[in-house]
Amino acid sequence: MSRRRVVQKRPVPPDSRYNSRLVSMMVRRIMRHGKKSVAHNIVYDALATIEERTGSDPLELFEKAVRNATPLVEVKARRVGGATYQVPMEVRSERGTTLALRWLIHFSRTRSGRSMASRLASELMDAANETGSAVRKREETHRMAEANKAFAHYRY
């Protein structure tokens, strides 16, 4: 780690259509090879699909999906005297949101379906209903932390 001064976190500006920082974060995570307009189209199409299928506010459902996929604890590897322990650590809110978005996008990409927008919409709706791969990943992370509770005193 650098011993110089700490780098200031740059604020994420809210997106233009929904005025939401979360949507903006999602767009930035979906973007590949600097093609932000393509990422915008994917996210906006997914939210439009959600509105079409459910008839409710897509932003509300999106926020609920992210909340349901956000982990509260995770395990980190810590080496102590030749042995590596999986130490459970609490997740800060910002990291939790980042992990949730990462998992939602990852499992959207691995889903079967035609377009990325439809796959993302399906994954978001599943996460909002507390099903789907991203929520399962969160529960798996919580189970790992629970199983390794004995090593919690190695926290750093």
From Swiss-Prot:
SUPFAM superfamilies: Ribosomal protein S7. The keyword rRNA-binding applies. GO terms for cellular component: small ribosomal subunit. InterPro entries: Ribosomal_uS7, Ribosomal_uS7_bac/org-type, Ribosomal_uS7_CS, Ribosomal_uS7_dom, Ribosomal_uS7_dom_sf. It comes from the Bacteria. Transmembrane segments: none annotated. Keywords: Ribonucleoprotein, Ribosomal protein, RNA-binding, rRNA-binding, tRNA-binding. GO terms for molecular function: rRNA binding; structural constituent of ribosome; tRNA binding. GO terms for biological process: translation. This is Small ribosomal subunit protein uS7. It comes from Arthrospira platensis. The gene is rpsG.
